[in-house]
A protein has these predicted regions:
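Extended, histidine- and acidic-residue-enriched regions that form the cofactor-binding/catalytic faces
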Residues: 1-107, 113-254
Length: 254
């Protein structure tokens, strides 16, 4: 296993410049009454570990950043959120350190949708400030799992604690899933709007409390470890394929 923290300093010098460096990032936040706070971080970490095992591409895995931008879930006990300013500062310091070590390509493996917009900003800034080639991969977001774990009852509103995440957790860590607490929670009232939505031409600011009484935005009731296995393997395969393409990617010289 190629773990950044397992290298000695002098050994790392020899491989940093030629290796992709993977930084998984997740969250510690509520996922409804049935899933643990660590859900996003655990899935991102497991996908990253398996992708490192399977990829032929020279790559090194950094320790996961477990805290993310989770302000939309702060109403719920247990959620820990960094502010956008703090998380950007952490990522900037990370980029500066990696650039000093000779790293050329950094890949963020994001396990939490709330991090996405900020990670896009950070990716641009790290390119501008330190010359790092930065990439953002979403290994398991529900939107990427629709063809693998489908549930008509979710109707396009499966963004948090639904069948996809619950199935993944039943496969990876079933002892942390409270099967007796599975409950469908869908903001059906959003269907009356044709333009406003999660993936439509008009997006909106929201908290989980605006959309759900129990923190779930989805329908986990049909979740299964078998579906979770399919979803996990699809996520890993997607990351491995992305890493191979990222390794070959270069900007042209003008």
């Amino acid at each position: 296993m190629r773990l950044w923290s397992s290298y000695s300093s002098i050994d790392l010098e020899e491989v940093a410049g030629s290796s992709l460096v993977l930084q998984p990032i997740g969250s510690i936040e509520q996922h409804g009454p049935h899933l643990p706070l660590v859900t996003d971080s655990l899935i991102a970490q497991e996908v990253a570990l398996q992708a490192i095992r399977e990829t032929p591409t020279a790559s090194i895995l950094l320790p996961i950043i477990s805290y993310g931008l989770s302000s939309e879930h702060l109403h719920a006990s247990g959620t820990i959120s960094l502010s956008p300013t703090t998380l950007l500062a952490v990522l900037d310091d990370l980029g500066a350190s990696l650039a000093r070590a000779g790293v050329e390509k950094l890949v963020f493996l994001n396990g939490h949708g709330g991090n996405s917009a900020l990670l896009r900003v950070a990716s641009r800034e790290l390119r501008v400030r330190y010359g790092l080639m930065t990439f953002l991969v979403h290994p398991h977001l529900p939107v990427d799992q629709v063809s693998v774990v489908s549930n008509d009852r979710e109707g396009g509103f499966a963004i948090h604690g639904g069948v996809a995440e619950t199935s993944m957790m039943l496969y990876l860590k079933p002892d942390l899933v409270h099967i007796d607490r599975l409950e469908r929670s869908i903001p059906d009232w959003l269907r009356r709007y044709s333009k406003i939505g999660f993936g439509g031409p008009v997006t909106f600011g929201w908290t989980a409390a605006d959309l759900s009484s129990n923190g779930v935005i989805g329908d986990p009731t049909s979740a299964s470890p078998e579906a979770g296995k399919r979803s996990f393997e699809a996520g890993v395969s997607g990351v491995v394929a992305a890493l191979e393409e990222i390794q070959a990617f270069q900007f042209p010289q003008y």
